[in-house]
Amino acid sequence: NIPQLTPTP
């Protein structure tokens, strides 16, 4: 998993 600020819908 790639860390991300906004979750994917």
From Swiss-Prot:
<keyword id="KW-0078">Bacteriocin</keyword>
<protein>
    <recommendedName>
        <fullName>Bioactive peptide 3</fullName>
    </recommendedName>
</protein>
<keyword id="KW-0044">Antibiotic</keyword>
<comment type="function">
    <text>Has antibacterial activity against the Gram-positive bacteria L.monocytogenes, L.lactis subsp lactis and L.curvatus H28, but not against the Gram-positive bacteria L.curvatus CWBI-B28, L.brevis and L.plantarum or the Gram-negative bacteria E.coli and Pseudomonas sp 55. Has no antifungal activity against S.cerevisiae, Penicillium sp BKS-TAN2 or A.niger.</text>
</comment>
<dbReference type="GO" id="GO:0005576">
    <property type="term" value="C:extracellular region"/>
</dbReference>
<dbReference type="GO" id="GO:0042742">
    <property type="term" value="P:defense response to bacterium"/>
</dbReference>
<keyword id="KW-0964">Secreted</keyword>
<keyword id="KW-1015">Disulfide bond</keyword>
<dbReference type="GO" id="GO:0031640">
    <property type="term" value="P:killing of cells of another organism"/>
</dbReference>
<keyword id="KW-0929">Antimicrobial</keyword>
